Every structure is written in structure tokens, then in C-alpha cells.
């Protein structure tokens, strides 16, 4: 996020943050040299085989799942394995897919993707636990109100967060709370009747998996200056002030 009053030397500040957040010092012990003079002309080649800084991409988790089940990594899976250390399912872990039918849960693609990632020393981000756009929820879910709706929300949280506790390091808990008109989506408020429902959702998720980082996520915040930036800040500030355990924020961008 770069505000209107961005610093003139923003690239310089960014490089300072890279030095601070993405890099660390390393010590190399060299044995077999009798004196420091022997090391004057020593040439040392270091090849980095992996890194701790998360660098990932969205993938079609059905294709990853197919690779896992077949035991063969096709070109798609091989490319993901070679270039990234973190994955996020574009669709297959979202509630609309996992819970198409009431009281039925389809975690097959998600489970297989997590297992495939573990085999290849990769991580999977949970995306997304809940979605604030009404139309992106199962039809049966959209017809619930009051206590029945809240129970369905909690069932989704309990099922998904508990299932991947210790396996998924991060969850996008509530996805896209800003609509096309730059106003807050009120799906959870409208259906639950509870003005504090968003905070309760985060609190329940954190209680089930304390070690998992919980995120808000939204799109069009960085490159759209029509009010989404300010509204996102307002949402975050309001939730933090109400005691919502938010560990990070997502800035979703799609580029081709």
C-alpha cells in the first residue's frame, strides 16, 4: 500500500525493508586452512537451494491433486515445484466448493494439495475460510438466518481450521469485504443479526489453531484509488479496536 503522501525515495525505503525482512547474516566455517594468509585467494561458491522468504502463487488445486494421486508431476506441477515455496488454491478450498451441499464436506483437492506440498517442502495458504460476497457462498448457506446461520458459519470454521491445524500456516479468514460500490459487504451481519460476528469469527478461528496466522484479504486496494484503500484501512482499524485477532492483511492483485 502506497498512500498519497508516499515518500519520494520509496524505492530506497523498500530496499531497506528488504535488507531487514528478507535477508539475514550467515557464518561460514572453513576448515583445513593453516593460516589466514592461506585464505587470501580463496574462492567460495555458494549455491542457494531454498529460501525461507515465502514466494508463492495461486494454483489450480485439482491439477495438483491429480499429480498427487497419480504419483507423477506433469509440466504444471513441476513448474510450481521448481519456482515457488508456497501455494494457494484458487478455488478448491473455498466454502462454495467444499460445502456445495448442506452437511457434506469435500476436502479431497485441498487434502491432496497439502500432502503434495509437504512432500515437496512447500506450504499451502488457506484461501479462503469465509467469503463476504453472498453470491460466492453455497445456495443453501445463503438461505440461513439467525442462530441457524451462525451455527453453519461455526461449523465451517471448526471443520476447516481444525482439519488443517499445524499443516496450513495462514488462513484468509474473511475474503473480500469490500464490494464493487466500495461499501462494506454486510452478508454476515445481515444473516446473523450480530454486529460483532466478524470479530467472533476470528476469535473462534484463533482458539482452534493458535499458531495459525489469520488474515483479512481484499483486492483492488493497491491499484485502485477510488476509496477502497481508505475503506480497507477503516475496516482493519475497526476490527483491531474491537479485539479481533488479525495477524496480517492480504493485498490481492491479479496481473497477466
Annotated model-derived regions:
Residues 1-63, 86, 95-99, 125, ...:
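Beta-strand-rich domain onsets/edges
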Residues 28, 87, 117, 160, ...:
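Conserved, mostly hydrophobic/aromatic
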Residues 32, 213-216, 240-256:
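Substrate-binding and catalytic surfaces of secreted/luminal carbohydrate-active proteins
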Residues 49-111, 116-123, 128-148, 250:
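N-terminal substrate-binding region of glycoside hydrolase catalytic domains
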Residues 61-63, 93, 130-132, 175-179, ...:
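Active-site-proximal loop/turn and secondary-structure-junction residues that shape catalytic pockets
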Residues 65-76, 182-185, 224-242:
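Distinct, well-ordered alpha-helical segments
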Residues 99-109, 136-234:
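Active-site cleft segment of glycoside hydrolase catalytic domains centered on the general acid/base Glu
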Amino acid at each position: 500500500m502506497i498512500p498519497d503522501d508516499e515518500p519520494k525515495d520509496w524505492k530506497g525505503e523498500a530496499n531497506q525493508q528488504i535488507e531487514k525482512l528478507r535477508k539475514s547474516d550467515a557464518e561460514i566455517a572453513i576448515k583445513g586452512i593453516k593460516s589466514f594468509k592461506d585464505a587470501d585467494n580463496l574462492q567460495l561458491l555458494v549455491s542457494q537451494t531454498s529460501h525461507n522468504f515465502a514466494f508463492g502463487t495461486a494454483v489450480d488445486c485439482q491439477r495438483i491433486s491429480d499429480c498427487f494421486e497419480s504419483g507423477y508431476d506433469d509440466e504444471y506441477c513441476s513448474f510450481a515445484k521448481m519456482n515457488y515455496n508456497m501455494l494457494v488454491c484458487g478455488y478448491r478450498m473455498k466454502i462454495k466448493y467444499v460445502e456445495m451441499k448442506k452437511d457434506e464436506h469435500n476436502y479431497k483437492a485441498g487434502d491432496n494439495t497439502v500432502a503434495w506440498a509437504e512432500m515437496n517442502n512447500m506450504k499451502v495458504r488457506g484461501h479462503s475460510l469465509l467469503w463476504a460476497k453472498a453470491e460466492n457462498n453455497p445456495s443453501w448457506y445463503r438461505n440461513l438466518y439467525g442462530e441457524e446461520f451462525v451455527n453453519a458459519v461455526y461449523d465451517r470454521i471448526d471443520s476447516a481450521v481444525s482439519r488443517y491445524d499445524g499443516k496450513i500456516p495462514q488462513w484468509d479468514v474473511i475474503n473480500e469485504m469490500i464490494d464493487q460500490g466500495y461499501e462494506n459487504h454486510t452478508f454476515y451481519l445481515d444473516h446473523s443479526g450480530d454486529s460483532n460476528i466478524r470479530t467472533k469469527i476470528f476469535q473462534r478461528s484463533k482458539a482452534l489453531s493458535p499458531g495459525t496466522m489469520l488474515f483479512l484479504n481484499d483486492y483492488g486496494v493497491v491499484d485502485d484509488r477510488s476509496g477502497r484503500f481508505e475503506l480497507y484501512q477503516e475496516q482493519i482499524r475497526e476490527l483491531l479496536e474491537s479485539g479481533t485477532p488479525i495477524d496480517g492483511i492480504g493485498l490481492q492483485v491479479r496481473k497477466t
